[in-house]
């Protein structure tokens, strides 16, 4: 096996124009899952935040494949978080020279993908490697898959 420098790849989004609660609703469903499982879940979710988060996961996967020799089927989401940002404040012009304030909620999104094959030191047969990857993936998720 080739020695990889980093088992993790990142995707960041700052000032994402959606409230943190709406983005957390989607992020909580994909945290700790494999890359392929995440794509299926995000394609089927009916929320507005699902498509941009799907793009961020794909960006992180392409970062992983370009910076190291990791395969997409060995990736899983090790960290996914949403942080609030102060609201963007605007004024909407109204009739008779008045204006109403508008607050647009925004958030920061961070997604980290980890390569499971990085933790194997010896070369194993393909069937054994798949079984070992599955066992390691299940051990890393543990009993709770939320956080």
UniProtKB/Swiss-Prot annotation:
Q: Which InterPro entries match?
A: Ribosomal_uL22, Ribosomal_uL22_bac/chlpt-type, Ribosomal_uL22_bac/org-type, Ribosomal_uL22_CS, Ribosomal_uL22_sf
What Gene3D superfamilies does this protein's entry cite? Ribosomal protein L22/L17 (3.90.470.10)
- GO MF, one annotated term: structural constituent of ribosome
Source species, domain of life: Eukaryota
Q: What is its main location?
A: plastid
Q: How does it assemble?
A: Part of the 50S ribosomal subunit.
- Write down the PANTHER family for this protein, in alphabetical order: CHLOROPLAST 50S RIBOSOMAL PROTEIN L22-RELATED, LARGE RIBOSOMAL SUBUNIT PROTEIN UL22M
Family recorded in the similarity comment: Belongs to the universal ribosomal protein uL22 family.
Described function: This protein binds specifically to 23S rRNA.
Q: Mind telling me what this protein is named? A: Large ribosomal subunit protein uL22c
Q: Which organism is it from?
A: Cuscuta obtusiflora (Peruvian dodder)
